[in-house]
From Swiss-Prot:
Residues 1-49 form the F-box domain. It comes from Arabidopsis thaliana. Coiled coil: none annotated. This is F-box protein At3g03040. Signal peptide: none annotated. It comes from the Eukaryota. Pfam families: F-box (PF00646), LRR_At5g56370 (PF24758). GO terms for biological process: defense response. InterPro entries: F-box-like_dom_sf (IPR036047), F-box_AtFBL13-like (IPR053781), F-box_dom (IPR001810), FBD (IPR006566), FBL60-like (IPR055294), LRR_dom_sf (IPR032675), LRR_FXL15/At3g58940/PEG3-like (IPR055411). SMART domains: FBD.
Amino acid sequence: MDLLSSLPDEVRCLILSFLTTKESASTSVLSKKWRNLFALVPNLDFDDSEFLHPEEGKRERDGILQSFMDFVDRVLSLQGNSSIRKFSLKCETGVPPARVNRWLCEVLQRDVSDIDLTIDLGYGYYLPEELFVSETLVNLKLKSAFNIDWWPGAEGTSLPMLKSLCVYGVRVFCDDELQELLPCFPVLEELQMSNMQWLDSDETVSSATLTTLHITGIRSENPKSISFDTPNLLSFVYTDFVAEDYPLVNMKNLSLARLALRANDDQIKRVRGPSNDLLEYDVVRHFGNVVKLMNGIQNVQELHLCPDTLELLSVCCESMPVFNNVKKLLIYSDEDRGWQAVPVLLRNCPRLETLIFEGIVHHVTDKCGDACDCIFRKDKGRSLKSCPVKVVEINGFGVTMKEKYLIEHFLDYFSCLKEMKIYINCEEDGVTQQVMKNREVSKLVLDEMEEYNEFYSCNVKLFLCKKKSIPQ
């Protein structure tokens, strides 16, 4: 008897659970004992790429797609009515939607707790109604390269055990507002919605159980109001057009927040101009209410701000709250967006330890303050001197004189700085990479870094990295 066959059934079943379903199913040919054991494997993972790839054009061969569907049918049949813990399905267009729904209904009848679907079945596909009345479902993840009209509405929905809901699509639709959706999931802890089409211009996200909320909204205009009543939230990632108002923001226990508030170029232009030039009905007049959102997240420990967000915060610098708990601040920069809010952010984070820049090239305005050296001013470096930051990390360094001057500005005025990490932008075929291939230039850059270490008490390190990516 081989070593594996001599192991207890519980151990062999555990081993099978770490294999793909295709690999696990192949053990059933060894003996009847292995076949019976496979029927008890609680995790099923079906991926059509194992049948249809990597050979180019293999999908089009007669019978290949059919063999995948037959394999899923055989496995489900072989397992009989045994319980399923996790069901993962990845399949592209070509599998009939009715067949996919039949598989889903079968695993739902077998008390599945975790469903992970990556299904590109084309437009007009609807998930089975049975998926929304499960008494055992705990985790549900949906992903598609098409639009997802994923939820039929609050009426008839009952998922009392659901703790994690993640939906990713080109465009995600809901037939009801979020305030109607969330009560259907009374113990939900994680909600992630990518490219969600908001149903209304006034929305409220209210849940006492949510700890993770990641939303990317899609709309053509600024919403009237968005409220968040989520007192136990720990992680908040929010991308959407800036709202005219944030009446309620309750996030007292927040650990991480990343804000990507959007505004179009014309709105940004008006934000930079005098407020008395704005027309009475101009939506930009209400952008100052973004301070209500900042007040609601002021207990956060790690804060990420994207380029548009920085510009929008410039309209509420005078009323910006103090972030007493922020120890890590990450700033995404863009050459078309300004740093007007950076000085007040540095002053209002009295316990800041780590400051990360995803790029330091930004739009220069006369309101950038003393955070940069783009414009000469008498109070140069004031906000930097009072900042307690110990570590500065700069990603996407393009080896330009403008960037080097700004790095020296940081070294001159961050009085508590102990370490600076600089990551060169090394995008393939990029200008920076071509420059660094020049031995004389690369030697000059390295020599400058050595001079920094000799002249400043701060430890300056130079690394290579991929091109910075700015969240949209």
